[in-house]
Amino acid sequence: MNASPAAAPARSLAAVLAFAALIVCVAMGIRHTFGLFLTPMSMEHQWNREVYSFALALQNLMWGATQPFAGFLADRFGAKRVLWGASAMYALGLLGMAYASTGTGLAATAGVLIGASQSGCTYSVVFAALGALVPEARRAWAMGVVAAAGSFGQFLMIPVASQLIGGLGWFGTLLVFSAAALLIMPLGSALTRGLVAAAASRGQT
């Protein structure tokens, strides 16, 4: 009889939850700070509100539209590769957003690139990894914990972003966030090491 997926000890489960929660906290936390950049960026580049609003609307559209694709890639190539690719795209999108001087550039970076990257480093891919790592009896609870971490990231990053913008300006803050997005790479590696162990465990039972 096969064991349930990832019948891991409590310590391993705690580590899995910590890595998954941190990934979602970083990704969702940064995502929910973008409204703070509207006024300073619009004033700097002499944009009307519609330019920035369109980029954020496009970001939301891309996030939703690419989530099934991110899930497919995670199934086909593994969650680690998707998380790494999404992390790189997120960082590149934030960097490009900092240097965007036209509405088209903003739409391409803050809209298309960041929106697509978020589908690969938020709930769809992370929850898929949890489904393979966490025993079925605790799976719903684990997903609730990670979802709460995303909400905490939103709560935490708003005042952090506000302070950074006040001290470093919007440009410097986007550079800091670009570097922060790269943290998803090592966190993703740490999370998905458990996927390899779980697969090996299932193969031996």
Where are these regions (language model features)?
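Pair of pore-lining "gating" transmembrane helices in MFS-fold secondary transporters
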Residues: 10-33
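Residue-level signature of mid-helix packing/kink "hotspots" within the transmembrane helices
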Residues: 32, 60-68, 154-155
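Extracellular/periplasmic helix-loop-helix junction of adjacent transmembrane segments
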Residues: 36-64
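Conserved MFS/SLC helix-loop-helix module at the cytosolic interface between two early adjacent transmembrane helices
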Residues: 65-104
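A generic transmembrane-helix signature of 12-TM secondary carrier transporters
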Residues: 87, 91-94, 109-110, 178-185
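Cytoplasmic helix-loop-helix junction between adjacent transmembrane helices
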Residues: 110-148
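Helix-loop-helix hairpin linking two adjacent transmembrane segments in secondary transporters
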Residues: 146-197
